[in-house]
Swiss-Prot record:
Reactions listed under catalytic activity: L-citrulline + L-aspartate + ATP = 2-(N(omega)-L-arginino)succinate + AMP + diphosphate + H(+)
Protein name (Swiss-Prot/TrEMBL): Argininosuccinate synthase
Primary localization class, coarse: cytoplasm
Gene Ontology CC entries for this record: cytoplasm; cytosol
EC numbers: 6.3.4.5
Species of provenance: Danio rerio (Zebrafish)
Enzyme class: ligase
Binding residues for L-aspartate: T118, N122, D123
Pathways involved: Amino-acid biosynthesis; L-arginine biosynthesis; L-arginine from L-ornithine and carbamoyl phosphate: step 2/3; Nitrogen metabolism; urea cycle; (N(omega)-L-arginino)succinate from L-aspartate and L-citrulline: step 1/1
PROSITE patterns recorded: ARGININOSUCCIN_SYN_1 (PS00564), ARGININOSUCCIN_SYN_2 (PS00565)
Length: 414
């Protein structure tokens, strides 16, 4: 008799294929679920593989459009950067994947969900917090945290032997000496030879971006139009190409940014579970959009509002990274950020060239930039004499600080 029905987040790779068979060995019926979030994957082959391994059903879900609109766009509005550098490509994808996983579980009457995330990483937290937030009654089977599983499979060699024994198709190409995770927003690389933070990334590691040294000698000049803080159109200023749907916009910017080697970073970051890890990331389209959004936002947003919004962006980044997308605090922050974008509207022109994004100009019907007010040639409503009082008022605390420091110094010299 079956122990119950499990929806497995299935990739078609060695790990989750072995997990699928292992779950069946444990007495579960398994539904294999594959999320298309823009990775390079032959989904028909993966479907046939899952069916051959005994999956009761296989669901392949195209989540690319909702990934862009419901996850990438809110992160862009917030200028979300974890620890000032990481654009959160993996972190944003996990709640998108897990949300559909629990939807399938609820629809199919499954009591369990399962994933192949390791017991040392962030993804286990992100998957499971999403599952519990959206389907509180669900039970999670995390094989890499179950002693019977991880003691049995201590490495790739054990998985390969298990696969051979159970007629699981195995990769015919040598495994790269690092792990890789890809989606529409980015590709991440970690583990293996990259675990030594001193090791340079091999030149053949990068798949989404060209080496800037070998990128075209001719820049691509683009215009990106924003409304309420999200891009609604991107146009090439020379060849006339224009994209308007969210998915088309993002894919096109990935193409242009990747061609010029934009968006590569190599960092050591702080995982939520307490350890530091090294990650190498390629995020071409996201990097182009971040620079454009920063520019139009500063152009149209009040200074003090933006200061508050910046602090919310930092908190939002931490919540995303740590797996709290569907928490009440993250919902609150998203709503605040969305409200801040009400007047973030206009066009930014930029150049993409050899690993860099150069802002060329901007215009907006809701700009707070007053050319006459700021001009050195026109006095306008601003009286330069008023600056004297402004400076004196701001100097009061500096003078008081100096007085205190002087008194302390005098006592020290006695």
């Amino acid at each position: 008799m079956s122990k119950g029905l499990v929806v497995l987040a299935y990739s078609g790779g060695l790990d989750t294929s072995c997990i699928l068979v292992w779950l069946k060995e444990q007495g579960y019926d398994v539904i294999a679920y594959l999320a298309n979030i823009g990775q390079d994957e032959d989904f028909d082959v993966a479907r046939k593989k899952a069916e051959k391994l005994g999956a009761k059903k296989v669901f392949i879900e195209d989540l690319r459009s909702e990934f862009v609109q419901e996850f990438i766009w809110p992160a862009l509005q917030a200028n979300a950067l974890y620890e000032d550098r990481y654009l959160l490509g993996t972190s944003i994808a996990r709640p998108c994947i897990a949300r559909r996983q629990v939807q399938i579980a609820q629809r199919e009457g499954a009591q369990y969900v399962s994933h192949g995330a390791t017991g040392k990483g962030n993804d286990q937290v992100r998957f499971e917090l999403t599952c519990y937030a959206l389907y509180p009654q669900v039970q999670v089977i995390a094989p890499w945290r179950i002693p019977e599983f991880y003691n049995r499979f201590r490495g790739r060699k054990d998985l390969m032997e298990y696969a051979e024994k159970h007629n699981i198709p195995v990769p015919v190409t040598p495994k790269a000496p690092w792990s890789m995770d890809a989606n529409l927003m980015h590709i991440s690389y970690e583990s293996g030879i990259l675990e030594n933070p001193k090791n340079h990334a091999p030149s053949d590691l990068y798949q989404m971006t060209k080496n800037p040294e070998h990128s075209p000698d001719q820049a691509d000049m683009l215009e990106i139009e924003f409304k309420k803080g999200v891009p609604v159109r991107v146009s090439h200023l020379k060849d006339g190409i224009s994209k308007e749907t969210p998915l088309e916009i993002f894919c096109y910017l990935n193409e242009i940014g990747g061609k010029h080697g934009v968006g590569r970073i190599d960092i050591v970051e702080n995982r939520f579970i307490g350890m530091k890890s090294r990650g190498i990331y390629e995020t071409p389209g996201g990097t182009v959009l971040l620079q454009a959004h920063l520019d139009i936002e500063t152009f149209t947003m009040d200074r003090e509002v933006r200061k508050i919004k910046q602090s919310l962006g930092i908190k939002f980044s931490e919540l995303i990274y740590n797996g709290f997308w569907f928490s009440p605090e993250c919902e609150f922050v998203r709503e605040c950020v969305e409200r801040s974008q009400k007047h973030v509207e206009g066009r930014v022109q930029l150049s993409v060239y050899k690993g860099q994004v150069y802002i060329l100009g901007r215009e907006s019907p809701k700009s707070l930039y007053n050319e006459e007010l700021v001009s050195m040639d026109v006095q306008g409503d601003y009286d330069p004499c008023d600056a004297s009082g402004f400076i004196k008022i701001n100097a009061v605390r500096l003078r008081e600080h100096n007085r205190l420091q002087g008194a302390a110094l005098s006592k020290h010299n006695v």
